[in-house]
Amino acid sequence: MQPLLFQSASRNGSVQSGTPVERPSGLPVLFHEKIAPMQSSHSSAQNLRPLIPLADYQRIFRVIHSVLHSVEADIPAASFFFSVTAAQILKKFYKRNAFPVAGAAFYLIREDGGGALSFGSLGDDGQSVTSHQDAFHAWVQCDGYALDFMAPLFQELLVSAGHPLPVPRQMFQKDLQRMSADVQALAKPGDFYLASNLELTRELLQQFMAKKALTNLSQLCLEWFRKPPKVMPDDLALQGADGEVSRIKLQATAIEGVW
């Protein structure tokens, strides 16, 4: 199915029924909605502090992005690679219990509260969400947090889906207790709703591990990464099967803030 720009006008804070929103290969679509502000029902114990500093998040993102860029990968469709590799970095260098998760994801990204980035399928009732091999997103879950290392590329993801809108390059890592109750509860930029799909995660992980090219690239990221404040090499030498040496340059994509 081709990407859709989902338009809806809500009544009493609810999303009108419409065509389910899907995007092949996990690419996003943007749907517009007007949602009445809601009182937060989250626990007062929710943690507002990030799990890792912005500098560390940015470095993890840059390493993975640079390696994928060097092999001309389809980066907008690489959320699972980002998540698997970032989880391994968090395990190895930060001793965190991190793991990749696939499923449906919804992020409110517009200041006026009128647009949400959607990965997966939204049902006619405006509440039920589903995900599958052709409509999903992936993120990292770690010690009660959700971290999305593709968040700095949300604008590129929208462009690839046919919705060129300006989106700031920002870090996404949130205490899961801060997650909205459902899609309709998204009220301000940075609000999110995630629906994990364990079966899909297992399938994607099995497929990932079966592809040596992917596991080699992921391992390359782990070998290149240096945890701050250690100095990070600006490039990495690679020797091909024919003995030719090429160099991967570290992309200097800057993250401007946080969701």
Ranges and model annotations:
Residues T19-P20, P28:
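Intrinsically disordered, low-complexity segments enriched in serine/proline and basic residues
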Residues A9, G13, P28-W259:
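A structural boundary/capping signal
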Residues P3, S8, S17, R23:
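Cationic, low-complexity basic patches in intrinsically disordered or flexible, solvent-exposed regions
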